[in-house]
């Protein structure tokens, strides 16, 4: 399967010090050897490879997501250059979804003029209201970042910027009330949002995750959020995780790495031009995301031929025996690949969130089946 989503890292530094960050605070520390900012030479090589791949496979629609670190640290000129370079390499008729994923702290009127001019959509990471958000997403000196992020979001929600609004990302903390968090996010009127499980694995379990007790704290949190979202009198926003589970239950295919068995269809390009697998693998071990290839010497098709990438396009065959025997495997898909890791055993075991995912899926399934039976769906 060709690559349809390219994550282009234009900055490897960040203006926040989030304590759950998989890039800076977990097992992999390769960021220390990366350039702080991407160069125009690397941008040119990266966008040329993207265009080459699009042409070779006759793709009609692709996404390029500008990432970091904090990508806005690269500055307005870098954004302008990247946008121009990406569009120059596109074959005629190809639709490009050019987005940036930011913590929102640096968003201001001047930046929005640039973003509007180059049609760069904006996703913002925010974890709920002030108390929820500032548990983790703080500045290096310890000050919370909520006020600055909220200020940027209010600008994003203004009429002249609204068409750029891609959505919100929220990392789950089970200490926070899920309904409070969801409703705090709704205050910014997002067109879409997603709840992300904090990165962890069997060798470094996520907070509050003990498989010995059989408890499912993350499922309970997500179930409360799901029920609040699902039972609203009208759809207040799209929630990707919930919609993907429903889509899979109804026989569809997944469009996210969190659930489902669809082949991986994205690649990361770091600030030095190196190709990498999904960034979340940095939570597993040093070098977990590396493939030893780069935009200067290798095509995107070469990345597709790498054994680690090929193994993630095998669907059910890439999973361990216990997953393949599971009744919800087509929905769960083994969960996020990074969450399956165990030191000395690799990635061929269930997700560290296995019990939570199973509980959540059964709950969503019961709700959807009841509505289908009653004719309310």
Language model segments and positions:
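Short, non-ligating residues that shape and space the ligands of small metal-coordination modules
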Residues: 27-28, 332, 363
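Radical SAM enzyme [4Fe-4S]-AdoMet core and its adjacent flexible, acidic
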Residues: 136-147, 154, 158-275, 280-292
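Accessory C-terminal segments flanking Radical SAM cores
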Residues: 243-355, 359
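Canonical Radical SAM [4Fe-4S] cluster-binding loop centered on the CxxxCxxC motif
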Residues: 2-41
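Short Fe-S-cluster ligation motifs
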Residues: 45-67, 349-377
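Cysteine-centered iron-sulfur cluster-binding motifs in ferredoxin-type domains/subunits
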Residues: 9-17, 70, 323-325, 329-330
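Short acidic/His/Gly/Ser-rich catalytic and metal-binding motifs that mark active-site loops
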Residues: 16-21, 29-30, 130-134, 202-206, ...
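Radical SAM/AdoMet-radical enzyme domain recognition
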Residues: 47-65, 74-198
């Amino acid at each position: 399967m060709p690559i349809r989503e390219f994550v282009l890292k234009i900055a490897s530094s960040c203006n926040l010090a989030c304590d759950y960050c998989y890039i800076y605070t977990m097992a992999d520390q390769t960021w220390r050897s990366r350039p702080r900012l991407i160069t125009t030479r690397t941008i040119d090589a990266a966008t040329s490879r993207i265009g080459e791949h699009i042409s070779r496979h006759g793709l009609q629609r692709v996404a390029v997501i500008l990432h970091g670190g904090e990508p806005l640290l690269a500055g307005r000129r870098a954004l302008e250059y990247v946008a121009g370079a990406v569009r120059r390499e596109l074959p005629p008729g190809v639709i490009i979804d050019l987005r940036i994923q930011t913590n929102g702290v640096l968003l201001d009127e001047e930046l929005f003029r640039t973003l509007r001019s180059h049609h760069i959509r904006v996703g913002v990471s925010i974890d709920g209201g002030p108390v929820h958000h500032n548990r983790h997403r703080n500045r290096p000196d310890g000050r919370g970042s909520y006020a600055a992020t909220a200020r940027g979001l209010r600008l994003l929600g203004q009429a002249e910027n609204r068409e750029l609004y891609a959505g919100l990302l929220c990392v789950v903390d089970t200490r926070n009330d899920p309904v409070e968090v969801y409703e705090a996010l709704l205050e910014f009127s997002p067109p879409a949002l997603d709840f992300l499980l904090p990165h962890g694995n069997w060798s470094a379990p996520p907070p509050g995750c003990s498989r010995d007790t059989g408890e499912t704290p993350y499922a309970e949190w997500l179930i409360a959020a799901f029920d609040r979202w699902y039972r609203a009198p009208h759809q207040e926003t799209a929630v990707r995780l919930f919609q993907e589970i429903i889509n899979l239950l109804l026989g569809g295919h997944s469009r996210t790495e969190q659930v489902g068995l669809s082949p991986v269809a994205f690649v990361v390009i770091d600030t030095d031009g190196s190709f990498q697998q999904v960034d979340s693998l940095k939570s597993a071990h040093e070098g977990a995301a590396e493939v030893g290839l780069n935009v200067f010497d290798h095509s995107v098709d070469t990345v597709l031929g790498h054994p680690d990438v090929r193994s993630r396009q095998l669907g059910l065959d890439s999973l361990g025996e216990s997953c393949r025997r599971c009744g919800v495997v087509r929905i769960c898909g083994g969960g996020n690949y990074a969450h399956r890791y165990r030191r000395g055993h690799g990635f061929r075991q269930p997700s560290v969130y296995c019990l939570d995912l199973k509980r959540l899926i059964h709950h969503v399934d019961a709700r959807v089946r009841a509505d289908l039976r009653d004719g309310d769906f």
